[in-house]
Amino acid sequence: MLNAVSDSLLSIFYPQNCHICKNSVENRANGVACEACWKNTHIFSDKDVICGKCCAFLPESGHTTEAFCRQCDEHVYDSVRAVGVYELALAASIVHLKTTPFAVEKLRFLLNKAFLASPFLNTDLIVPVPLSSRRLLERGFNQAGLIAGSLSKNTGIALDEYSLVRTIHTPMHRAAMDKKAREMTVKNAFEVKRPKLMAGRNILLIDDILTSGSTASHCAKALKKSGASKVNVLTLARAA
C-alpha cells in the first residue's frame, strides 16, 4: 500500500517515461521500462526449451533434462542460464546499468529468480566477469560485479571479485562483430591471481550479456586452469 502511494506521488512530482515506448512508468520497481514493455520482453521460463550452453531456442522435443544444440560444444564453461532475451525492457535496463549503477532493483530481482530456478544451487563461489583496469577507471564500477554482489547477498554464497582479472584491455564488443572477431579480442585476456581459492570449487560466473560466449569461455578456461571443478554461467540476457 505504502509503495503504491509512494509510486503515485513520485509519478506526479518526478515523472519518469519508459525508455522504450515513452509512456509513464507507474511502478518504480520496474526501473526504466513500463509494465507493458516488460510484459512484451521475453523472460525465460520453464516452458522454454533452450540450449544449456548458448541459450539458443531449441525445437520442442519433450526434454525434461538439459538440452544442447551441439553448435557450441567448444565452450569451456559447463552450462549457462540467462534471465531472458536481450530486447525491449531487458536491453534498456542493461544499457542503463552501464551508466547508472544504483538503478538495478529489477535486474537484481530477475537474476535472483533465474538463479533459484537454475541447476546451479550447489555453487561454492560467485565470480563476476572482470573489466580491465582502464575500463574500470573509465566507468567507475563493474556492472557484472554489482549484480554478482547482489546475488551473493541474497543467496549467502561467497563472492570473489578480485581473483579473476582481465590482464589485457580489449576493445568493446560491437553488434557487427562476428564470432571469430569476438574470440580474438578476449583470447588470453584473463588470468587468476589466487588460484588456491578456485581449486576444487564449483564457480558461478556472472555477466550482463552473453553473445558468442567467447568472453565467458575464456574466463572459464582461466578458472579451470587454476583448478576449478566446474564453471557455470549466469547472465542477464542472451543476445542474438
Where in this protein do the model-derived segments appear?
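Glycine-rich phosphate/pyrophosphate-handling loop used in enzymes and phosphotransfer proteins
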Residues: 1-207, 211-240
